[in-house]
Every structure is written in C-alpha cells, then in structure tokens.
C-alpha cells in the first residue's frame, strides 16, 4: 500500500532539503540515483540510524530538512523509535516524514501512522518500480504551495 498525505505537498518551495535515514548503502545509492533520474536535485543528507538522525536534526549547524525519508529497520534506534522522539520535540514534529521501508507488517504501518507520518511507501525490489515510488514523493512535493509552520 502506497500512502502519502497532503502535508508532503507543503514543503517544496521554501524547504528543499531532504534527510534520508537509511542504513543500507544499496538503498541509499538507489534513492540518490532515482532522485537524480527524476530531476530532483535538492541537497540530500544521509545518516544510518535514528540516533544519528536525531543528532543531525538537533545540530543547529545542519540545515533543517523539508522532508525526511525514513527506513524502519535500522540498528541502534529504529524508525518507529525515531518517530516517537521527533514527534515529542516541538522544533521537529512538523517536519513531514515519509517511511520508505521493506516492511509489509500491518503493525509497522499502524505504528508509523500513529506517530503522524505523512506517508508510508514500500520499497520495491526492482529499480523501475522504485523510481515510480520516488516519483510519487516528488510529484506530491513539487505541487506544494507553502512550507509548514
């Protein structure tokens, strides 16, 4: 099931930075390649787990992303734990998060939406389908009118 809320549409014009929280280097390269193939040339920072993601977001020297792409299955702090942390932080809770995962578990999907994610996308196995998945994210993002407050 591919689900993205309208909230993702609100970030394109003023916050064009993406944070990818993903521990699998092949998936990182696939995300980078698919965004490039789609003409999305916004800065993309990558960290490998939820703890590193929190550290990145809380470091004032780093740019605030307009969108977080989040894997669920990671070491140290998984995606659901990361979501719980940022949704309690007034400075971070309004950043749209799209879960990009291989998990087809209904419990993971529900736990993600319980923590107010903007979207939940399954990582396709083949590259053309992956590009189509990233295109959905890009299309929602590119139709935005204003950034979240």
Residue ranges and their predicted role:
Residues 118:
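Short, glycine/charged-rich "phosphate-handling" switch motifs in NTP-dependent
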Residues 32-33, 46-67, 131:
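Acidic, metal-coordinating helix/loop segments flanking the phosphotransfer/catalytic sites
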Residues 22-23, 99-104, 124:
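Conserved active-site segment of CheY-like receiver
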């Amino acid at each position: 099931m591919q689900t993205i809320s309208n909230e993702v549409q609100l970030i394109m014009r003023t916050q064009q930075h993406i944070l990818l929280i993903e521990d699998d280097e092949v998936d990182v390269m696939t995300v980078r390649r698919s965004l490039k193939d789609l003409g999305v040339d916004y800065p993309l920072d990558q960290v490998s787990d939820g703890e590193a993601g929190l550290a990145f977001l809380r470091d004032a020297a780093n740019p605030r992303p307009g969108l977080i792409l989040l894997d669920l299955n990671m070491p140290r702090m998984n995606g659901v734990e990361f979501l719980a942390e940022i949704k309690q932080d007034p400075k971070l809770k309004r950043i749209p998060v799209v879960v990009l995962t291989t998990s087809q578990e209904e419990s993971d999907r529900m736990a993600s939406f319980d923590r107010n994610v903007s979207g939940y996308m399954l990582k396709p196995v083949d590259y053309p389908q992956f590009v189509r998945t990233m295109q959905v994210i890009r299309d929602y993002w590119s139709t935005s009118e204003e950034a979240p407050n």
